[in-house]
Amino acid sequence: MAVFEGTYQVLGTPRFGIVISRFNDLITTKLLEGCQDCLRRHGVDPNPHGSQVDYAWVPGSFEIPLVAAQLAATRRYAAIICLGAVIRGQTPHFDYVAAEVTKGIATASMQTGVPIIYGILTTDTMQQALERAGIKSNKGWEYALNALEMANLMQTLPSAINPPTTKLSSSTRILTDG
């Protein structure tokens, strides 16, 4: 029986994509800083003018899955990290956005086979978001660590001869053999 587990070691010179929401940028820029710090400390150069990390800024969290899917479809990235903050307000808007972003990121990852890290804070208050973006800890660091581990794991997993494809049918994912 085999056991597969990723490490935080960078194999080769992997390229990462980071998709960041401008909405709630007080939070998302702090998440980005934590993410960049983690990547740097693990041997990845986060310089936007370098060759290891590409950045895509989008208007809000709702737009993140589309851009993440497009980046992943290029097969240029070992992993994509999505950074956003959805904070509950007085309307049901929070529920719709949080649910669709979650589904969209999961679908994009399954369809492309590229690890797409869910780095979307969903909090009830701005204070909770601030605590997770640097006051108490920085979740951006954790999201980058997840990306490193998943990139490494995907490199070590055996390749499938005929990998399953994901098809969408009535918003339900169905795995098929062809």
UniProtKB/Swiss-Prot annotation:
Belongs to the DMRL synthase family. Its EC number is 2.5.1.78. Pfam families: DMRL_synthase. The active site is at residue 93. CDD domains: Lumazine_synthase-I (cd09209). (2S)-2-hydroxy-3-oxobutyl phosphate binds at residues 90-91, 132. Keywords: Riboflavin biosynthesis, Transferase. It comes from the Bacteria. GO terms for cellular component: cytosol; riboflavin synthase complex. It is an enzyme of class 2 (transferase). SUPFAM superfamilies: Lumazine synthase. The lineage of its organism: Bacteria, Bacillati, Cyanobacteriota, Cyanophyceae, Acaryochloridales. GO terms for biological process: riboflavin biosynthetic process. The gene is ribH. Gene3D superfamilies: Lumazine/riboflavin synthase. It catalyses: (2S)-2-hydroxy-3-oxobutyl phosphate + 5-amino-6-(D-ribitylamino)uracil = 6,7-dimethyl-8-(1-D-ribityl)lumazine + phosphate + 2 H2O + H(+). Catalyzes the formation of 6,7-dimethyl-8-ribityllumazine by condensation of 5-amino-6-(D-ribitylamino)uracil with 3,4-dihydroxy-2-butanone 4-phosphate. This is the penultimate step in the biosynthesis of riboflavin. This is 6,7-dimethyl-8-ribityllumazine synthase. One of its GO terms (molecular function) is 6,7-dimethyl-8-ribityllumazine synthase activity. 5-amino-6-(D-ribitylamino)uracil binds at residues 23, 61-63, 85-87, 118. Pathway: Cofactor biosynthesis; riboflavin biosynthesis; riboflavin from 2-hydroxy-3-oxobutyl phosphate and 5-amino-6-(D-ribitylamino)uracil: step 1/2.
